[in-house]
């Protein structure tokens, strides 16, 4: 779609990160500079006349599918206060009420069984997905291997052209039962061995020509062993056990990090098609030509030595934050990579911040639990490190560059530049500078690349702001050599226009630029919607953080081109957990989670943990039976009625 309708966007370094922060140790920094991006501007004349309205509807339809971003890290005992590993995890999910995950403890071991495990699981799903047992603690973030492809294929009657062959298609009927209503019937057109044909209206604008369809294939089209793998974690006694069960999972595209008292491990083993040598001439992250036999999957997959895995390396720590495991994306190119794994990873701001903070902590002395907890709550925005120096430089040129003359003698500019220059760059609730920077960042993004993205600008921005901001920063900081082609009026004028729009926003929203009139916590927070449309959710609470910070609280700024009065995050850390090991090698966890462990809105446990989550206060996750019995406030015993057998 990009290359067809928005060529200037397609030629941007779409997957080059903002920071050289990669999961595996000893990955060299390539430099975050792409030689050239081709700024071939498009008039969008080929778009349907109602394309803008279509994208608005599409943006609304996908908004609920984004689950945010996650962090985990592990530190080997050589760097910790007690000589044993530390593990941290804050998985990000949609924040609903009741919660998608719940805390639970399963113990059959005391009665001769195999289980003694505690942590969090998705409601209705067996096993503890994230937590610890008596030996092992484990965590996960989402990895982004490319496990699927799209092809533009020619169709005729009930046949599909794959390479040089016409393959018969088959219709499979899927029935979805809906309580109290008629069944929903779907006819799925499959091409055996090659995938399924997507509906014609899957995208808001046409992507293929007449008599063509989009063929979709995914390595998960078949039975897989994720349930076995997660249950295996619950019973694992060593890192070898942990790694064995990771390797059983075919489509669990997660960065699994495990720890025992003996060490730490990072492992991910998804089924990724082996597509041969990668090439920018035929990139698999774009739609492929189904008539080219060379694009069709061969049935081979990347081998174990090509997948992410390590035990901390010489540095003795592991960080994952949805970032590139290998560093293949560093130059924004596929050519020269040893194989193709994927490209659409996080821009690296969270991973970079965590890595720099861990390095600082380790250099200063043994790392403590409290330091791990503080890092989970970190709201420093690295994007300010990119944009504020540009603002300072542009404003310093106002009186020497006549092209900027309209911005001379602006007291409001003086005030805002000084405010952001002296700011600590933390997106905290009591910060007025955070309000100003957030607005300036979004306006600068729109000024820099909004015209290139055209009607899809807000769709991409609303799905995940940090990606669109990444593109703008790459242009504004000259990370592509021909960045000036994307800024026809010059960098300084672009920046000051964004500041001028920030002033207008502050005047409209707060009656002026005086920082005493606004703080981040009054306009930014998390909205907890009920999982049922007619249910009563918790509502809105002020929360720290923003897009791209370790404590992620990502919210959009625009709606239909107009700044929003309130900025709502709807996803975030569904729980935060930090785990140490006691002298007997048993994991001990400190945790906070939201909104509560009860699913009934009338329950006293429906939102009783919300305040601790907002303030990042931790409590021990009780695991020892004596501690549990001593703190039990309510119990329910279920017994099987053997008289009915």
Regions found by a protein language model. Give the residues of each.
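Glycine- and hydrophobic-rich flexible loops that cap the catalytic core of alpha/beta enzyme folds
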Residues: 67, 106-127, 131-290
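Primarily extracytoplasmic ectodomains and periplasmic/lumenal surface modules that are beta-strand-rich
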Residues: 81-82, 93-95, 136-138, 145, ...
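Generic recognition of flexible, low-complexity loop/linker segments
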Residues: 60-63, 71-77, 83-84, 114-118, ...
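Active-site-adjacent "gating/activation" loops or surface patches in catalytic cores
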Residues: 63-69, 78-85, 89-100, 205-225, ...
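Substrate-recognition/specificity elements adjacent to catalytic centers across diverse enzyme folds
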Residues: 1-86, 91, 97-98, 123-127, ...
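Short, well-ordered alpha-helical packing segments
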Residues: 72, 76, 85, 92, ...
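Conserved structured core elements
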Residues: 69, 85, 95-98, 132, ...
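Long, compositionally biased non-active-site segments enriched in small/hydrophobic residues and glycine
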Residues: 1-46, 260-645
């Amino acid at each position: 779609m990009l290359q067809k309708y928005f060529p200037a966007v397609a030629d941007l370094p779409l997957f080059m990160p903002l920071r050289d922060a990669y999961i595996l140790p000893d990955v060299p920094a390539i430099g975050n500079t792409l030689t050239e991006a081709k700024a071939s501007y498009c008039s969008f004349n080929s778009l349907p006349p109602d394309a803008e309205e279509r994208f608005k509807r599409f943006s609304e339809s996908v908004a609920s599918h984004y689950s945010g971003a996650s962090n985990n890290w592990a530190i080997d005992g050589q760097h910790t206060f007690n000589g044993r590993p530390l593990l941290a995890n804050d998985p990000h999910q949609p924040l609903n009420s009741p919660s998608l995950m719940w805390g639970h403890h399963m113990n059959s071991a005391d009665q001769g069984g195999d289980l003694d495990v505690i942590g969090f699981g998705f409601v209705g799903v067996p096993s503890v997905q994230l937590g610890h047992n008596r030996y092992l603690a484990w965590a996960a973030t989402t990895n982004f291997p490319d496990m699927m492809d799209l092809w533009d294929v020619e169709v005729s009657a009930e046949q599909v052209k794959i390479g040089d062959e016409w393959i018969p298609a088959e219709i499979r009927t899927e029935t979805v039962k809906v309580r109290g209503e008629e069944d929903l019937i779907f006819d799925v057109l499959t091409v055996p061995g090659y995938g399924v044909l997507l509906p014609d209206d899957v995208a808001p604008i046409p992507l293929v020509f007449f008599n063509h369809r989009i063929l979709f294939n995914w390595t998960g089209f078949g039975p897989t062993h994720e349930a076995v793998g997660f249950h295996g974690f619950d019973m694992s006694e060593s890192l070898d056990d942990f790694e064995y069960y990771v390797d059983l999972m075919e489509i669990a595209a997660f960065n699994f990090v495990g720890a025992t008292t003996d060490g730490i491990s990072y492992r991910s083993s998804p089924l990724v098609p082996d597509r041969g040598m990668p090439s920018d001439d035929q990139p698999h992250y774009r739609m492929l030509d189904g008539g080219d036999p060379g694009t069709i999957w061969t049935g081979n997959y990347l081998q174990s030595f090509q997948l992410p895995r390590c035990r901390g390396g010489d540095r003795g720590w592991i960080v994952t934050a949805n970032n590139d495991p290998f560093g293949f994306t560093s130059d924004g190119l596929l050519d020269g990579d040893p194989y193709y794994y994927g490209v659409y990873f996080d821009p690296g701001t969270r991973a970079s911040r965590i890595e720099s903070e861990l390095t600082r902590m380790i250099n200063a002395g043994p790392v403590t639990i409290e330091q791990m907890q503080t890092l989970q709550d970190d709201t420093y925005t690295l994007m300010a490190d990119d944009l504020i120096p540009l603002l300072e430089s542009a404003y310093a040129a106002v009186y020497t560059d006549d092209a900027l003359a309209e911005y001379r003698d602006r007291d409001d500019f003086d005030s805002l530049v000084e405010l952001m220059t002296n700011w600590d760059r933390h997106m905290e609730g009591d910060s007025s500078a955070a309000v100003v920077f957030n607005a300036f960042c979004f306006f600068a993004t729109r000024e820099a690349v909004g015209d290139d993205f055209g009607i899809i600008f807000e769709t991409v921005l609303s799905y995940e702001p940090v990606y669109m901001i990444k593109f703008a920063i790459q242009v504004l900081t000259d990370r592509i050599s021909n960045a000036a082609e994307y800024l026809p009026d010059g960098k300084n004028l672009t920046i000051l226009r964004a500041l001028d729009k920030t002033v207008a926003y502050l005047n409209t929203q707060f009656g002026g630029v005086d920082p005493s009139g606004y703080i981040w916590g009054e306009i930014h927070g998390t909205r907890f919607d009920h999982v049922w449309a007619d249910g009563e959710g918790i509502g809105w609470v002020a929360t720290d953080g923003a897009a791209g910070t370790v404590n992620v609280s990502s919210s959009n700024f625009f709606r239909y081109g107009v700044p929003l009065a309130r900025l709502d995050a709807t996803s975030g850390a569904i729980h935060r957990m930090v785990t140490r090991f006691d002298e007997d090698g048993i994991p001990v966890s400190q945790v906070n989670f939201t909104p509560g462990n009860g699913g009934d809105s009338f329950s006293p446990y429906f939102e009783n943990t919300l305040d601790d989550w907002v303030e990042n206060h931790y409590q021990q996750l009780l695991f020892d039976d004596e501690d549990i019995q001593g703190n039990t406030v309510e119990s329910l015993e279920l017994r099987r009625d053997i008289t009915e057998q």
